[in-house]
């Protein structure tokens, strides 16, 4: 069982992981391979950390919880810029999707490390950190529950949109057979741009929630503990379906929080960190034969093949 502090962390980690899976879903359903989820999360966490400094007057203060209604939306908005870069390279310039995703991951880590190493001169702080600190309570905080419920509602809305609307049908068809969509006079490129941008915005939201789970602790590693790569594994295991990904994601989030809680009291801390990734690999090996990825994933749209 999880302690109260671990449960509080789970209420932030679980939505972050589920939204990271949704980020991959949104891109790959329009045929764009998205291994940039981790980088998108790092950018979201970076924006969240930088914005949190705007609500503190000195190093002994934490940002007020009401400012989350400002910093989280702004983090998502700034992440749309990363989405535009992703779409520009993958759709407009027709670059290899895997290389583009790798580039975004490296860029995110590099920028975060650079800012963290210069935190003393930029923020008069010892290191880059998220300036939110939720007081210890006898129950899970309202902020954590609110984030969890909002994330589930957002995922439910996307599921309904993709499953029961004309827009969702067209969206998914772009990743299966874009030429059929093109013959109907519908812009394939428009849907791919929307998919890439929304994917990075959701990844940014995921990253901002992740750093809240480690609030007021250093965010100087240039990474989100590889949570974006676990999200890719969950997306594959759930066969690019939203509902199965929710249940699988909640289980993985529990395993992630539990193993991390044991790191401080165990000499084999580095080995414990690998457990979520080992589980991901084993499950992928066991259920890899069920791979039902979108048929046009990773392929650039060509009008000449109509």
Swiss-Prot record:
Disulphide-bonded residues: none
InterPro entries hit by this protein: ABC_transp_permease (IPR001851)
Top-rank lineage group of the source organism: Bacteria
Example of a GO cellular component annotation carried by this entry: plasma membrane
CDD domains, A to Z: TM_PBP1_transp_TpRbsC_like
Record key words, sorted: Cell membrane, Membrane, Transmembrane, Transmembrane helix
GO MF term list: transmembrane transporter activity
Protein name as annotated: Uncharacterized protein MG121
Lineage, top ranks: Bacteria, Bacillati, Mycoplasmatota, Mycoplasmoidales, Mycoplasmoidaceae
């Amino acid at each position: 069982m999880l302690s109260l502090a671990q449960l509080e962390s789970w209420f932030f980690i679980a939505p972050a992981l589920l939204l990271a899976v949704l980020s991959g879903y949104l891109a790959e359903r329009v045929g764009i391979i998205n291994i940039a989820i981790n980088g998108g999360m790092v950018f979201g966490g970076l924006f969240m950390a930088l914005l949190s400094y705007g609500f503190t007057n000195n190093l002994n203060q934490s940002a007020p919880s009401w400012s989350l209604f400002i910093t989280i939306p702004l983090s998502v908005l700034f992440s749309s810029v990363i989405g535009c870069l992703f779409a520009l390279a993958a759709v407009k310039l027709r670059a290899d999707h895997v290389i583009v995703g790798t580039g975004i991951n490296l860029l995110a880590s590099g920028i975060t490390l650079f800012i963290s190493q210069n935190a003393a001169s930029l923020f008069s702080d010892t290191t880059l950190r998220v300036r939110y600190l939720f007081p210890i309570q006898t129950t899970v905080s309202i902020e954590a529950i609110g984030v969890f419920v909002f994330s589930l509602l957002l995922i439910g809305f996307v599921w309904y949109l993709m499953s029961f609307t004309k827009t969702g049908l067209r969206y998914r068809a772009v990743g299966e057979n874009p030429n059929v969509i093109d013959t109907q006079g519908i812009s394939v490129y428009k849907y791919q741009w929307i998919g890439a941008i929304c994917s990075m915005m959701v990844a940014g939201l995921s990253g901002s929630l992740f750093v809240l789970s480690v609030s007021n602790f250093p965010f100087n590693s240039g990474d989100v503990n590889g949570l974006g790569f676990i999200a890719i594994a969950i997306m594959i295991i759930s066969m690019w379906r939203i509902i199965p990904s929710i249940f699988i994601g909640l289980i993985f989030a529990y395993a992630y929080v539990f193993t991390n809680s044991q790191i401080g009291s165990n000499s084999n801390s580095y080995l414990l960190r690998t457990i979520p990734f080992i589980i991901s690999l084993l499950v992928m090996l066991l259920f890899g034969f069920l791979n039902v990825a979108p048929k046009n994933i990773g392929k650039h749209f060509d009008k000449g093949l109509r």
